[in-house]
């Protein structure tokens, strides 16, 4: 709430933080109106895609699209998180108009991986190919908002003298100081019982200099299952693949406090 995302990034760079990545940009819902075969490439097709304000031509090799499909379209000058292999690229990938085997292409249709997400979070997404929106998706609207991925993500290169900023709370504390605002850390209430973890497990610290303190808790009667979608999206935004509720909770707290955890 202290500043627009771009302004916050600019201020942080002046404070000495290197901005590596920002949010996805210029990605809308488009509907494929016409598909033709590429005259010079058997595995490519030429799509006429309605993006609400105009119809753009996009050349693709995706095997799963057909006329009438509604798909995420990144336009000329827009950015995606990475490639279809699911690996995020620092700074993202800027998409520019170009030619594919001699045919003009004015954008790109996206897989769920290129949008920085995974099939674990969106099981309806195909294993290979472009993400297809449901029929009620509105052409021309933000594809990122429709998918619930419209949170702004900054990736910073933290210098070795600022380990306090390895977690979200550290960055929030820095933002409060930068903008002369009050820092309001979350109030954590520790709930538990009188049982001792030492009654269940034994922890041996072999080198107190490297590990001056090790904390462990025993949690019983846990049902392993998927974590909530909001938590999965937060983790995926930080480059962490959601596993299950127990593992995801520890990773979420680690990202929040900068404290390594394991379950």
List each language-model region with its residue ranges:
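Short, well-ordered junction/capping motifs at the entry into regular secondary structure
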Residues: 1-2
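Glycine/proline-enriched, intrinsically flexible loops and inter-domain linkers
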Residues: 6, 45, 179, 183-263
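Phosphate-backbone binding interfaces of nucleic-acid-interacting proteins
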Residues: 5-6, 10-195
């Amino acid at each position: 709430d202290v500043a627009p995302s771009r302004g916050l990034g600019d201020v942080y760079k002046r404070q000495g933080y290197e901005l590596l990545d920002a949010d996805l940009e210029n990605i809308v819902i488009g509907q494929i109106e016409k598909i033709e075969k590429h005259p010079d490439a058997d595995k490519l097709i030429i799509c006429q895609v309605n993006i609400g304000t105009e119809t753009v031509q996009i050349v693709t090799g995706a095997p799963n699209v057909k006329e009438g499909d509604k798909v995420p379209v990144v336009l000329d000058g827009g950015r995606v998180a990475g490639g279809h292999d699911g690996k995020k690229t620092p700074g993202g990938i800027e998409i520019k108009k170009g030619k594919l085997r001699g045919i003009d292409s004015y954008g790109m249709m996206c897989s769920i991986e290129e949008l920085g997400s995974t099939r674990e979070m969106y099981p309806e997404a195909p294993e290979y190919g472009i993400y297809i929106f449901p029929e009620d998706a509105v052409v021309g609207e933000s594809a990122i908002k429709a998918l619930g991925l419209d949170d702004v993500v900054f990736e910073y290169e933290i210098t070795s003298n600022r380990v306090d900023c390895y977690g979200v709370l550290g960055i929030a504390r820095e933002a409060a100081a930068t903008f002369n605002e009050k820092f309001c850390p979350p109030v954590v209430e520790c709930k538990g019982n009188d049982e001792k973890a030492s009654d269940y497990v034994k922890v041996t610290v072999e080198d107190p200099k490297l590990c001056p303190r090790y904390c462990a808790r025993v949690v019983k009667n846990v049902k392993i299952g998927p974590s909530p979608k909001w938590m999965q999206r937060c983790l995926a935004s930080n480059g962490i693949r959601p596993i299950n509720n127990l593992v995801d909770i520890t990773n979420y707290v680690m990202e929040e406090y900068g404290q390594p955890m394991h379950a």
